[in-house]
């Protein structure tokens, strides 16, 4: 069985350390721990790394389409590699959770996260796994757009990093046992 883990974010140095790029940051760490490198797959508008874990093929994907169009990369990759959406996991930032909190879900709506909304639209299904990494709500007077495109302040940086570590630990556990429900039970 082939699995795909997607990290959502925005491409480019300008966005590298922003809250909206928690999915990219977590996927970069997972790739480092699995000792794989990304290469650009232009037809799929993505950076893709592949390896085998416990005898199963694994693709790690960073869409280069910008957050709100992520599904334009993910759907064609699923189709090309014949991966069922139940074997897709998407890691992303979550406004509705405190900074650094990690929540895993098996399916559901976008919850207002535009990258997830795009994946649902293009894949045509809500039945894929999610790893939500909390970035908290905007402080008083700040718009959601400015909040997600800003970096973490010093007091939240370490907490956010801990969330990334926990998300990666959850994915490694999932890859070892192949059971997302079991992973949810352990990490939620």
From Swiss-Prot:
Binding of tRNA, residues: 15, 66, 68, 114
Chain positions of site Stabilizes the basic form of H active site to accept a proton: 93
HAMAP family assigned: Pept_tRNA_hydro_bact
Catalysed reactions, semicolon-separated: an N-acyl-L-alpha-aminoacyl-tRNA + H2O = an N-acyl-L-amino acid + a tRNA + H(+)
Complex formation: Monomer.
Protein name: Peptidyl-tRNA hydrolase
Family assignment from sequence similarity: Belongs to the PTH family.
Alphabetized InterPro entries for the sequence: Pept_tRNA_hydro, Pept_tRNA_hydro_CS, Pept_tRNA_hydro_sf
Entry's EC annotation: 3.1.1.29
Species: Lactococcus lactis subsp. lactis (strain IL1403) (Streptococcus lactis)
Keywords (A to Z) from UniProt: Cytoplasm, Hydrolase, RNA-binding, tRNA-binding
Any Pfam family the entry gives: Pept_tRNA_hydro
GO terms, biological process: protein quality control for misfolded or incompletely synthesized proteins; rescue of stalled ribosome
Active site: 20
The UniProt record lists the keyword Cytoplasm: yes
Molecular functions (GO terms): peptidyl-tRNA hydrolase activity; tRNA binding
Enzyme class: hydrolase
Lineage top rank: taxon: Bacteria
């Amino acid at each position: 069985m082939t699995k795909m883990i997607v990290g959502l974010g925005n491409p480019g140095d300008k966005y590298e350390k922003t809250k909206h790029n928690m999915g990219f940051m977590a996927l970069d760490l997972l790739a480092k721990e699995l000792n794989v490198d990304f290469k650009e797959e232009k037809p799929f508008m993505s950076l893709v790394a592949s390896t085998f874990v416990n005898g199963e093929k694994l693709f790690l994907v960073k869409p280069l389409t910008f957050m709100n169009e992520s599904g334009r990369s993910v759907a064609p990759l699923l189709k090309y590699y014949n991966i069922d959406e139940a074997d897709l996991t998407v890691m992303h930032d979550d406004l509705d959770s405190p900074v650094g909190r990690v929540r895993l879900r098996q399916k559901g709506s976008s919850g207002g996260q535009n990258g997830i909304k795009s994946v649902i639209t293009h894949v045509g299904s809500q039945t894929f796994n999610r790893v939500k990494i909390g970035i908290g709500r905007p402080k008083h007077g700040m718009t959601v757009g400015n909040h997600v495109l800003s970096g973490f302040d010093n007091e939240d940086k370490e907490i956010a990093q801990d969330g990334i570590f926990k998300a990666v630990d959850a994915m490694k556990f999932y890859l070892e046992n192949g059971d997302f429900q079991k992973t949810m039970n352990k990490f939620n």
